[in-house]
């Protein structure tokens, strides 16, 4: 049966841990290896800005940049360690949820979704750039 975008987001959020901005901030402070990925297209970043420590890898590019079986020139070196803590965050959370699920399906074992995305991060008083 075909799924809608909202159904896929709900399924992703049911399968991948969702964390609050406060918990995400704390995790980033406690473990500097934590990688924050913003899966929006670069043109969409100015809407809310980006978490300063975040790496912008669009959802489309993430599908191959996280695949360690592809040639090295296609991959993102920051994604070699499948146990590295990763937080996915888009503007409001939906694309972050799909990206978190994608990474989990690709074998990443320590992935979380930022609840409410970058907008919730900003609303909680944390900086963006």
Language model features by range: what are they?
Residues 1-34, 39-85, 92-129:
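Rhodanese-like catalytic fold shared by cysteine-dependent sulfurtransferases
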């Amino acid at each position: 049966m075909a799924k809608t975008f909202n159904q896929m987001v709900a399924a992703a959020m049911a399968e991948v841990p969702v964390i609050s901005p406060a918990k995400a901030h704390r995790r980033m402070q406690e473990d500097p290896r934590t990688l924050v990925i913003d899966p929006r297209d670069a043109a969409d970043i100015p809407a809310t800005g980006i978490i300063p420590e975040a790496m912008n890898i669009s959802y489309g590019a993430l599908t191959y940049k996280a695949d360690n079986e592809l040639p090295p020139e296609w991959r993102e070196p920051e994604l070699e360690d499948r146990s590295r803590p990763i937080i996915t965050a888009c503007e409001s959370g939906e694309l972050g949820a799909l990206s978190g699920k994608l990474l989990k399906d690709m074998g990443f074992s320590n992935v979380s979704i930022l609840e409410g995305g970058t907008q919730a991060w900003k609303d909680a008083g944390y900086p963006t750039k």
